[in-house]
């Protein structure tokens, strides 16, 4: 039989245990400072319709647009407009069709970037990036469609909407040219999440120093980690933003045989197109546990001419970009969010960032705040 002292002692221990458990639960709601950013397993694109069986309420389509070199600056990009319904949609999927004009696609694997103007802030956001195939062996009947989920841009896709198209190749001829056709599939419904805030973190297409909308990598005096490039950026989050999606679009280009200074006994493999890299995400001056990898296996790429089966830095000939998505938990004690991305250290073999073959990265990083 328990006496009063024993009963009191048991009650005290139970109370302490309950308080301890409560403390743990409370603490678990707030991630550690080095775990605020976590990469998700969201697919960058699909090779078949991810919403098969569900009918879009509206499809907004572009004409088939031939791809040729429009010019060096953003003001030379191909401009077009599409008219969307005025209401917001639950899901938005682009059916991105690679095709051709005249006798078939052009020869090479070049960068294509699609930008949309956000009416709210007037800025251009890269909604999709893709790479043309080695098209020599394809005829005029060839085409290939990919499906890209762009639901986070739904708020920008209302009414008369302006787009810019960039193509980084010079391979169009009088007989052959790559082309692209876009079908925006809009699905009605009430989303459980709503984007209430957007911001740009990095955009190399605005001030690329390589000549190709990219930032050179490892060239002395043109550090990609400079404040004007991949430097620290600070944002004030609106009070109603509960979570943040970070979209990281990085593709490597060039065939530079420089040196990764922190890799022991390593032989560079034509950076930055054919050599992999990693990046560290720094949130509010704290390096995150998860690191990003700039690499894409082309082992299962479909057959083309050329080096379509060689692994590359986040991309494959004839495919959309290997975009990476991160969720960021805003710090609990402040509405200030700073972001910094650090690549591995590299010393280029070149001294001029515009030298053909110089290692370079095309970079766009955007934030989407959810209520």
PLM features: residue spans?
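Short, intrinsically disordered low-complexity segments
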Residues: 3, 23-26
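C-terminal motif of bacterial Sec signal peptides marking the signal peptidase cleavage site
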Residues: 17-21
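Extracellular/secretory-pathway and virion-surface proteins
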Residues: 26-371
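Bacterial N-terminal signal peptides that target proteins for export
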Residues: 1-9
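Core hydrophobic alpha-helical transmembrane segments of single-pass membrane proteins
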Residues: 11-14
């Amino acid at each position: 039989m328990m006496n009063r002292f024993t009963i009191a002692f048991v009650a005290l221990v139970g109370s302490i245990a309950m308080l301890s458990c409560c403390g743990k639960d409370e603490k678990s709601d707030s991630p550690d400072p080095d775990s605020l950013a976590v990469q998700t397993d969201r697919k960058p694109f699909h090779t078949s319709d991810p919403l098969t069986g569900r009918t879009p309420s509206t499809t907004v389509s572009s004409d088939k647009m031939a791809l040729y070199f429009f010019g060096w600056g953003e003001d030379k990009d191909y401009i077009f407009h599409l008219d969307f319904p005025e209401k917001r949609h639950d899901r938005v999927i682009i059916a991105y069709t690679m095709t051709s004009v005249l006798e078939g696609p052009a020869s090479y694997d070049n960068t294509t970037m699609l930008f949309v103007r956000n009416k709210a802030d007037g800025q251009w956001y890269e909604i999709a990036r893709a790479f043309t195939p080695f098209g020599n062996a394809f005829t005029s009947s060839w085409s290939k469609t990919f499906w890209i989920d762009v639901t986070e841009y739904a708020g920008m896709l209302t009414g008369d909407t302006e787009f810019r198209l960039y193509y980084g190749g010079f391979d169009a001829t009088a007989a052959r040219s790559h082309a692209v056709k876009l079908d925006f599939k809009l699905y009605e419904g009430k989303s459980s999440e709503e984007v209430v805030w957007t911001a740009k973190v990095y955009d190399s297409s605005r001030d690329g120093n390589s000549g190709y909308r990219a930032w050179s990598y490892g060239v002395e005096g043109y550090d990609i980690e400079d404040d004007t490039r991949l430097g620290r950026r600070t944002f004030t989050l609106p009070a109603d933003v509960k979570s943040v999606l970070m979209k990281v679009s990085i593709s490597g280009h060039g065939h530079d045989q420089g040196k990764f200074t922190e890799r022991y006994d390593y032989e560079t493999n034509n950076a930055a197109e054919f050599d992999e890299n990693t990046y560290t995400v720094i949130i509010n001056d704290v390096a995150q546990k998860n690191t990003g990898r700039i690499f894409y296996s082309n082992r299962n790429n479909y057959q083309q001419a050329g080096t379509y089966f060689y692994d590359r830095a986040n991309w494959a000939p004839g495919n959309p970009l290997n975009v990476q998505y991160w969720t960021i938990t805003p710090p609990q004690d402040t509405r200030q969010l700073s972001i910094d991305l650090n690549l591995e250290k590299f010393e280029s073999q070149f001294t001029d960032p515009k030298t053909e073959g110089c290692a370079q990265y095309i970079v766009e990083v955007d934030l989407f705040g959810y209520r």
